From Swiss-Prot:
Additional remark text: The phosphatase activity of the PPP1R15B-PP1 complex toward EIF2S1 is specifically inhibited by Salubrinal, a drug that protects cells from endoplasmic reticulum stress.
GO annotation (BP), single: ER overload response
Amino acid composition bias (Low complexity), ranges on this chain: 123-134
Lineage: Eukaryota, Metazoa, Chordata, Craniata, Vertebrata
GO molecular function annotations of the record: protein phosphatase regulator activity
Source organism (scientific name): Homo sapiens
Main function: Maintains low levels of EIF2S1 phosphorylation in unstressed cells by promoting its dephosphorylation by PP1.
Protein name: Protein phosphatase 1 regulatory subunit 15B
Amino acid sequence: MEPGTGGSRKRLGPRAGFRFWPPFFPRRSQAGSSKFPTPLGPENSGNPTLLSSAQPETRVSYWTKLLSQLLAPLPGLLQKVLIWSQLFGGMFPTRWLDFAGVYSALRALKGREKPAAPTAQKSLSSLQLDSSDPSVTSPLDWLEEGIHWQYSPPDLKLELKAKGSALDPAAQAFLLEQQLWGVELLPSSLQSRLYSNRELGSSPSGPLNIQRIDNFSVVSYLLNPSYLDCFPRLEVSYQNSDGNSEVVGFQTLTPESSCLREDHCHPQPLSAELIPASWQGCPPLSTEGLPEIHHLRMKRLEFLQQASKGQDLPTPDQDNGYHSLEEEHSLLRMDPKHCRDNPTQFVPAAGDIPGNTQESTEEKIELLTTEVPLALEEESPSEGCPSSEIPMEKEPGEGRISVVDYSYLEGDLPISARPACSNKLIDYILGGASSDLETSSDPEGEDWDEEAEDDGFDSDSSLSDSDLEQDPEGLHLWNSFCSVDPYNPQNFTATIQTAARIVPEEPSDSEKDLSGKSDLENSSQSGSLPETPEHSSGEEDDWESSADEAESLKLWNSFCNSDDPYNPLNFKAPFQTSGENEKGCRDSKTPSESIVAISECHTLLSCKVQLLGSQESECPDSVQRDVLSGGRHTHVKRKKVTFLEEVTEYYISGDEDRKGPWEEFARDGCRFQKRIQETEDAIGYCLTFEHRERMFNRLQGTCFKGLNVLKQC
């Protein structure tokens, strides 16, 4: 019966322990079995129950492998999330940091399997895993993929203190390469403590987490950012069967892993670089980091450094390469600070000056010679300067003159002065003076001192004879600007306040007088035109002919003296009606003077451009502007109340005078309203509801009677 009972116990063993355990929670073995087994005594070496305890764990090994394959992509995704959490530390909760670096915890644990001392029972090499047991290797392989589960701390006592000691290169197996946190993977038979000096006054760090996976304990801790200069020291001890704990090793946070700085009190820019692994067997992470973020950070630092040093930041060329002579001259001008050390400065190359096209050397020299100030005329003449140097402007407060060296040019280059114009008036406007060296020499030997007193205008503010002979087209152009428009800004002759003038009683006679005067003026104008030898061409002969002159003036007067008050050339429509105040004066002795005839509170103007040349006047050719009253037919506006000689009388005493069409319309309207009222009184009751209902019933009764008669038939 004992074998039978033993056999029945073997069959009931799996049923009694048959529970669905998740693959990441392998079923716990019986007492004495562990993934980090203690050294077995001789009394337990031949116990067959220990061998049968591993059978339930082997049945769920394939579930573990299947889930490990499904969850294989999670470590890579988790690693990326952790990298970005370093960049945006405040965006992720601190409990996410507990998942950091679990993928390398087992590798660090395997790195300790090599015996470091003869005493194997006191070292971690005595706690090697049995790789032949599939129930043990499959959860460990699954942990290598970086899957990590969070639990509340039930057993272990962790105390956080700070200790700034030297680095311990021998204890680097458990530390993961992260900047602000640490993760430790320990068997359940080991006890861990974090020690620090209380006299340093450091406060505990961030939240602590202990995760238990079967016989393993994963301890994660977060460093306090305000105490990053303090290094926690981890003491790992092993508890033997007697209950005594012996120290196995220490683990200290290194400054490389925490990325400490000397100026930790000040905010630092984000760093996207990762530090290589500090333990053997773990592949180093990418030191390249995020090149885009690093590049942007470096650019921003360079920009801030330039701004702090006061350097001019590069700005785009707003003129697209085009620049004025003043800008080019300012580029060639020397700095007063450098002038004390070096009085000369080389001309920059064509590529240094901003521009789309490179100018030739000759064009540059011409531009420079045009900028030579007149102050150099007081110094020695141009022959005193070498041919390879061009004089520039004089520095203020300096006794020497800045020059531009053109020694690289071949041959002597002529020095050209300011371009002079043949017309003295235009040359004077451009800035010409009587002390110009090159223009002072006249080939005809004329005395320039006498001509220097002439400013280009005669004493009577008219153009000189020489200017008129040299530039007849300029005179016509000037006359075109001197328009006789009364509202012309250059020659404003319009009256500010309108005033009525005396209007002739006979408009027809005034028209005749004005037309006669215009004919006389035209004839005198044609006869008084100056005849100069310069007007010998065909066009000038046509301009001088009196017939053409008279026709052109008549044509112009026909446009100006139009009867249309809304004519744009002669707008005479009144803007505001007002009473007529008859005032004025008229001088018959001066027909050439301006005469303005104002009628109906608006000005009647006619414009004539005449070129009068009288022998008596000092200036034979002058421009005179006449505003003549044209031959207009004017009339006197009547007042609102007038008295006529013939008055029509209307007597209202008779009845026939009171009868009219309005009375007929009123009578017809009254008759029509009366007829409407009579019709409504006659047939208005037919539209009431009672009458309509009565008629409906009568018609309905008639119809039924007809139906009854048809039925009887």
